[in-house]
Amino acid sequence: MSVPLILTLLAGAATFIGAFLGVLGQKPSNRVLAFSLGFAAGIMLLISLMEMLPAALDTEGMSPVLGYGMFIIGLLGYFGLDRLLPHAHPQDLVPKRQQPIPGSIKRTAVLLTLGISLHNFPEGIATFVTASSNLELGFGIALAVALHNIPEGLAVAGPVYAATGSKRTAIFWAGISGMAEIFGGVLAWLILGSLVSPIVMAAIMAAVAGIMVALSVDELMPLAKEIDPNNNPSYGVLCGMSVMGLSLVILQTIGIG
């Protein structure tokens, strides 16, 4: 097994660290659940608007029309998917003065996992391809990706565990997002290698950024407020942004990104 592939596998596996952190101790309260959802929204917003979309637009040969167009397609694609799902909007699924029903959280977990997985898949490809061309650079990217994946795993596992009380279920959903990154690296190892088109990768990143922004604003933040109306979900959002921002600072400090 090649070193670039091992780096990609380890970076993706860091998601499980966050998942285990999300299920330690007693079942989280509604306040913790709401904070976790806000935390996840903060992660997605900062990654999408401060990392993925700018990186896509800065790609050589990428026009602003294509970049922003793919971002809008991602936004519209999310809302189209949301309308196709057989349930009401998540904040309508949480009964007043009751615990949030597991079904609504499960649906949110599916969408959250989908959004993070779509982000992680090209990230896995990028980690492998970069490490293949420059091993030192690959080590730095793998480290930054692992730092990203730990809070992402926590953000998925926390809400699912709070809703179901099942550690296995929480780790399962969190693990899917990490496996998407591993799958991207394996696919690059088997098929793509250094032939990944920068324009195609940039277009995918822009669209995924749109999906993640829509998911954060329309799904996660309203549900967090509905679950715990006495507290502001913005605290979780700001905390998630801070954690992701710190990882980006580390990334820039080591000369990457």
Swiss-Prot record:
Function: Mediates zinc uptake. May also transport other divalent cations.
Pfam families: Zip
Family: Belongs to the ZIP transporter (TC 2.A.5) family. ZupT subfamily.
Ligand binding (Fe(2+)): 120, 123, 149, 152, 181
Transmembrane segments: 5-25, 32-52, 61-81, 182-202, 203-223, 236-256
The encoding gene: zupT
Subcellular compartments: Cell inner membrane
Cellular component per GO, a single term: plasma membrane
Entry keyword set: Cell inner membrane, Cell membrane, Ion transport, Iron, Membrane, Metal-binding, Transmembrane, Transmembrane helix, Transport, Zinc, Zinc transport
Reactions mediated catalytically: Zn(2+)(in) = Zn(2+)(out)
NCBIfam families assigned: PRK04201.1
Record's bilayer topology term: Multi-pass membrane protein
Record-level Gene Ontology MF annotations: metal ion binding; zinc ion transmembrane transporter activity
Binding residue positions for Zn(2+): 123, 148, 152
Protein name as it appears in the record: Zinc transporter ZupT
Source organism of the structure: Salmonella arizonae (strain ATCC BAA-731 / CDC346-86 / RSK2980)
Cell inner membrane is among the record's keywords: yes
InterPro entries, A to Z: ZIP, Zn_transptr_ZupT
